[in-house]
UniProtKB/Swiss-Prot annotation:
Record note on quaternary structure: Part of the 50S ribosomal subunit.
Function: Binds directly to 23S rRNA. The L1 stalk is quite mobile in the ribosome, and is involved in E site tRNA release. Protein L1 is also a translational repressor protein, it controls the translation of the L11 operon by binding to its mRNA.
Keyword Transcription regulation: no
GO cellular component, one term: large ribosomal subunit
Classification via PANTHER family: 54S RIBOSOMAL PROTEIN L1, MITOCHONDRIAL, LARGE RIBOSOMAL SUBUNIT PROTEIN UL1M
UniProt-recorded Gene Ontology molecular function terms: rRNA binding; structural constituent of ribosome; tRNA binding
Gene Ontology annotations of biological process type: regulation of translation; translation
Protein name: Large ribosomal subunit protein uL1
PROSITE patterns: RIBOSOMAL_L1
InterPro entries: Ribosom_uL1_bac-type, Ribosomal_uL1, Ribosomal_uL1-like, Ribosomal_uL1/biogenesis, Ribosomal_uL1_3-a/b-sand, Ribosomal_uL1_CS
């Protein structure tokens, strides 16, 4: 039986469009009636059925409004770069001894960054890091000589954009407690990233078929982007 809170939500859960995203964000936040700080999420349907094979997107976006989450960042680097990593805010910094701990299953971090030189050693730990989604990836900015920038990006707020086998992408733009300006900046940063991805692909038609916005426990609204991506 539907709860009292659910009954108070709008009846339509789809096909509600908005030309002005600011108005839609206000509506989504208004429907966040639970006691916890609900996440505001975007979902995209990708036009991934192409004659030349499926479209696979995997990239990362730096969210100017942040994510509202504290990320524990670990860095595997040469000793000469250890201070740079610590000064940038890395929670754990190490080299060969740290790699041995990772091999033993000590994965007390949420993001792993390394230098290209150390990636050769970490690549042998695919069975340990891969299933947890922790293997550093140059395309995602987690393999870099510029350790300071990589750590800063990870700490300030990043989101991975990746479609599943059915062509769906899910990504959070923040929390109910965020100011509208934070959510807007994150929203547009994600769209800009998808637009760049489209430019790197050979497509027939648009990359994105449909876009929806919702909160953790709210209804889903269809977003009219105003431009084709």
């Amino acid at each position: 039986m539907p709860s009292k809170r659910f009954k108070q939500l709008p009846e339509k859960t789809k096909d509600l469009t908005a030309d002005v995203i600011e108005n839609l964000l206000a509506t989504v936040k208004k429907n966040c009636t639970t006691k916890f700080d609900e996440s505001i999420d975007l979902s995209f349907q990708v036009n991934n059925k192409q004659k030349k094979g499926e479209v696979n997107i995997r990239t990362v976006v730096n969210l100017p409004g942040g994510t509202g989450k504290k990320v524990k960042v670990a860095v595997v680097c040469e000793d000469t770069k250890a201070k740079e990593a610590k000064d940038a805010g890395a929670d754990i910094v190490g080299s060969d001894e740290f790699i041995d701990k990772i091999k033993a299953g000590e994965l007390n971090f949420e993001k792993l960054i390394c230098t290209p030189g150390m990636m050769v050693k970490l690549s042998k730990l695919g069975k340990v890091l891969g299933p947890k989604g922790l293997m550093p990836n140059p395309k995602l900015g987690s393999v870099s000589e510029d350790i300071k920038q990589a750590v800063t990006n990870a700490k300030s707020g990043q989101a991975e954009i990746r479609n599943d086998k059915d062509g769906n992408i899910g990504v959070s733009i923040g929390k109910k407690s965020f100011h509208d300006d934070q959510l807007l900046k994150n929203f547009h940063a994600i769209l800009d990233t998808l637009e760049k991805e489209k430019g790197n692909l050979t497509l027939k038609g648009d990359l994105i078929k449909n876009t929806f916005i919702t909160s953790s426990m709210g209804v889903s609204y269809k977003v009219k982007l105003g431009k084709a991506i």
